Amino acid sequence: MKAWVICLLVICAAVIAEPVESRNYIEYGAINKCAGPNPPPGCNPPGAEQKNPNPVNEYSRGCSKIHRCRRD
């Protein structure tokens, strides 16, 4: 009896289930954090894509005069 109920449920699930369409690619909006509703700090406001981003930190070799590193 239990086996018949399980078979009936499996058959009903197979008939009711709809095929799912898949995509071969991920849209850019899905991986762009700045395009979401709450962009993290550092994202440019909408419409400012043409502007150059401001550098966060200036470049430094990590070597100062006190360490007597080799000069270029």
From Swiss-Prot:
GO terms for cellular component: apoplast. Residues 1-17 form the signal peptide. One of its GO terms (molecular function) is hormone activity. One of its GO terms (biological process) is regulation of growth. Keywords: Disulfide bond, Hormone, Secreted, Signal. It is found in: Secreted. InterPro entries: RALF. Disulfide bonds join 34-43, 63-69. It comes from the Eukaryota. Coiled coil: none annotated. Its main location: secreted. The keyword Disulfide bond applies. Pfam families: RALF. Belongs to the plant rapid alkalinization factor (RALF) family. PANTHER family: PROTEIN RALF-LIKE 10-RELATED, PROTEIN RALF-LIKE 15-RELATED. Cell signaling peptide that may regulate plant stress, growth, and development. Mediates a rapid alkalinization of extracellular space by mediating a transient increase in the cytoplasmic Ca(2+) concentration leading to a calcium-dependent signaling events through a cell surface receptor and a concomitant activation of some intracellular mitogen-activated protein kinases. This is Protein RALF-like 13. The gene is RALFL13.
